[in-house]
């Protein structure tokens, strides 16, 4: 899963660097009460959260109520956490993401302004990823040369996979420039 892959890579890097850490697991059935985990991690400097923003918001609230001042660090899944928490703990949360809603890049500004006009809200990482996915697929579809609406779905899928993984195919979107490996794995710069 998304979270497990990030967790495994982070843990491997910590081991490689010789960084000491404490592991805590979260009950998949109980995603509302994180007091036991926060109590065990209270004296840590950083708590790594390879999760999505809903649970991260609950953990941030629990940290605030238990006097835990650790930096909560994660990836793009935390984009949106600000809407889940009180402003007093926002400075504790840090995450990396390929999308910056405040970017001055023309294509990003255009996307942000269009999104704001339509939804009366700022887009988050998930909206930007969806936008890029649609246009990457659209561009791959154009590259296939297939323009027959009645084309066989399997043939179309094969043609699109070939197009998107070709060495000359890339998509420069609002979250970065993307290329795809033969396996389908996406590389983003």
What positions do the PLM features span?
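Extracytosolic ligand-binding ectodomains
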Residues: 1-189
């Amino acid at each position: 899963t998304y979270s497990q892959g990030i967790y495994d890579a982070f843990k491997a890097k910590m081991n490689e660097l010789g960084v000491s850490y404490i592991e805590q697991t979260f009950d998949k059935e109980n995603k509302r009460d994180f007091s036991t985990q926060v109590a065990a991690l209270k004296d840590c400097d950083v708590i790594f959260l390879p999760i999505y923003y809903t649970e991260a918001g609950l953990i941030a609230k629990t940290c605030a109520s238990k006097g835990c001042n650790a930096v909560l660090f994660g990836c793009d899944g935390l984009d949106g956490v600000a809407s889940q928490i009180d402003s007093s703990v926002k400075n504790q949360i840090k995450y990396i993401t390929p999308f910056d809603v405040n970017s001055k890049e023309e294509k990003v500004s255009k996307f942000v302004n269009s999104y704001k006009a339509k939804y009366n809200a700022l887009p988050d990482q998930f909206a930007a990823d969806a936008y890029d996915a649609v246009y990457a697929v659209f561009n791959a579809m154009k590259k296939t040369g297939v323009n027959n609406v009645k084309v066989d779905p399997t043939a179309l899928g094969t043609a699109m996979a070939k197009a998107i993984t070709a060495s000359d195919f890339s998509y420069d979107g609002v979250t970065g420039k993307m290329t795809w490996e033969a396996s389908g794995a996406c590389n983003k710069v």
